[in-house]
């Protein structure tokens, strides 16, 4: 598992992607709940 030199670790990609997805979904639902969903 340590042979990831020169490449981005898969767990790092998964973590970043998960945070981005959760953040975008959270912002979208928060905007919709606040009445700003139509502007997204």
From Swiss-Prot:
InterPro entries from the UniProt entry: PSII_PsbJ, PSII_PsbJ_sf
Lipid bilayer topology: Single-pass membrane protein
Subcellular location per the Swiss-Prot or TrEMBL entry: Plastid, Chloroplast thylakoid membrane
TM annotation in the entry: 10-30
Family matches, as HAMAP family: PSII_PsbJ
Cited function: One of the components of the core complex of photosystem II (PSII). PSII is a light-driven water:plastoquinone oxidoreductase that uses light energy to abstract electrons from H(2)O, generating O(2) and a proton gradient subsequently used for ATP formation. It consists of a core antenna complex that captures photons, and an electron transfer chain that converts photonic excitation into a charge separation.
Keyword field: Chloroplast, Membrane, Photosynthesis, Photosystem II, Plastid, Reaction center, Thylakoid, Transmembrane, Transmembrane helix
GO biological process, alphabetically ordered: photosynthesis
Claim: Transit peptide is one of the keywords in the record: no
Organism: Marchantia polymorpha (Common liverwort)
Primary location class: plastid
Protein name (database record): Photosystem II reaction center protein J
Top-rank taxon, per record: Eukaryota
UniProt keyword Transmembrane present: yes
SUPFAM superfamilies registered for this protein in UniProt: Photosystem II reaction center protein J, PsbJ
Family: Belongs to the PsbJ family.
């Amino acid at each position: 598992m340590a042979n990831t030199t020169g490449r981005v670790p898969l767990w790092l990609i998964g973590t970043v992607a998960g945070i981005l997805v959760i953040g975008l979904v959270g912002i979208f639902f928060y905007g919709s709940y606040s009445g700003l969903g139509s502007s997204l």
